Amino acid sequence: MKPNLALRAACCALIGLAGCTNLPKAKDYSTALGEPQSQLQQDPNWSGGRIWVRPGPPIGSQFDKKLLMENVTYIPGDRPDELNFRDNAELRQRVLDYMNAALRREFSQAGYQLISAPAPRSVRLRAAITGTFRNDRDPRPGEYVPIGYVLGQTAKAAGLRDQSARLLIEASARDATTNQLLIASMGAVTGSNLPESRKPTAADVQGAIDDWARRVREQFDRIWVAEIPKTP
């Protein structure tokens, strides 16, 4: 590797690691979900995720695994929309249809009961895509990819990687009867590699959606028995 290229690669690696502790602040997000983003904490089990859990006893002590799922939406804000969800209605709908099916499949297969109307001890789940990105190619397995690095696009600026399709997705869980907020989640996930000249398709983000659905379901599994992480 040429010296100048090696230096650039090293700098990008350092910037990426710096993102581990330099996650985007709440003011950097525009979403209609209205959750307490300033209180979101790094999820210790998901480098690309942040989470908030209502203080108090474990969620599972007061709620059954009954979910009232609302249809996933796309919320345009001041976050990048590099996959053109805002203007491409067909692409957006294909992605949302796949996402709704993936989320329902993930939770039902894990033993959650999906209901169609509010019931005692049930939870309402909402989710929205709030940012789309074409940035540096997904690193090799095992590389750490914090949200700050995903959104910062540092390696893309250096021209060292191909591009990948990425999504920023936010979700909330509320008491289906009282609407009290129980869980707020935000995560960045990576789909297929995208040549710079090719337009994105729904297939390019299906892997990212499957990953996100699994990650959120795993968050719920852990939260149902013990709240993580603790709010300082």
For each of these PLM feature ranges, what is it?
Residues 1-10:
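Bacterial N-terminal signal peptides that target proteins for export
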Residues 17-19:
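C-terminal motif of bacterial Sec signal peptides marking the signal peptidase cleavage site
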Residues 71-75, 129-132, 188-189:
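Generic short beta-strand segments
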Residues 76-81, 136-139, 181, 191-195:
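Short acidic/His/Gly/Ser-rich catalytic and metal-binding motifs that mark active-site loops
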Residues 109-177:
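Surface-exposed short loop/turn segments
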